Amino acid sequence: MYELKKSKKSKARFFSTTSTYFSYRKHQLFKFYIPKNPSRNNTGKVSMRCKRKKFKNLDLAINYARIEMGRNCLITKLSFWKEKKPYVALVRDSYNSLSYYIAPAGFFVGRTLKTLPTKHDYYKKGGWKFYIRGLGTYVMLRVLRVNDVIFNLLSPSRVLYRLALAAGTYFKILYQSFCKTFYVMTIPSGLIIRVPSEGLAVMGRNSNTQNNKRVLGLAGVNFFNGTNPRVRGVAMNPVDHPNGGRTKTPKPERSPGVE
């Protein structure tokens, strides 16, 4: 008497058995999706480096907070993330789980990174400050001293400071306030900032310190590394380019978008 009519615009899928459903989910999970627009992904970010669909820059989910406590993580792989950014380390902890961390300078495959220490680790081996103040260890700012170098600074509200995130950059501790409520430190630009002492940071500096000395000499290779090649205005003709020609003229500077 009644008929079940399915709309053409409906995206509902019906499965006869449970095994069919899970096989479909497994197929969708490991399926390599290439969008129709080869220059952007589903979130609207530029991920494709070439329209030939040969190169793809993945947006890695990097664990900045390291909320796991008392774990020793083994570095299994070092990867190049983005241009002017530190290397990314794929680590495996004692619970056999994988995660991406920012690799400190001087760390290679096979070394261990320590997460936030537990209460037992603070009083281990007699000298608690000496034990947890190791390179690549995630520590609280209260255990830092003058002239210590840190990176990956987090505020007490678990918010990453948008400072010293480039390759080879770091924070330098100047002194602690008399009331011991904040630390005074410098950023790579030379600016002096104040950070609450309840924050967290990693001992050391960002990796990829020789990034500014790397010269490939080819615009096509730099394009796949995340750098957009720009043509100098001197190399353009002023006939068909508004910003072309020499600058030693009475005419003011103009941008390419201005008619």
From Swiss-Prot:
InterPro entries: NA-bd_OB-fold, Ribosomal_uL2, Ribosomal_uL2_C, Ribosomal_uL2_CS, Ribosomal_uL2_dom3, Translation_prot_SH3-like_sf. One of its GO terms (molecular function) is structural constituent of ribosome. Residues 234-259 are annotated as: Disordered. GO terms for biological process: translation. One of its GO terms (cellular component) is ribosome. Residues 250-259 have a biased composition (Basic and acidic residues). It is found in: Mitochondrion. Its main location: mitochondrion. Pfam families: Ribosomal_L2_C. Keywords: Mitochondrion, Ribonucleoprotein, Ribosomal protein. Belongs to the universal ribosomal protein uL2 family. This is Large ribosomal subunit protein uL2m. The gene is RPL2.
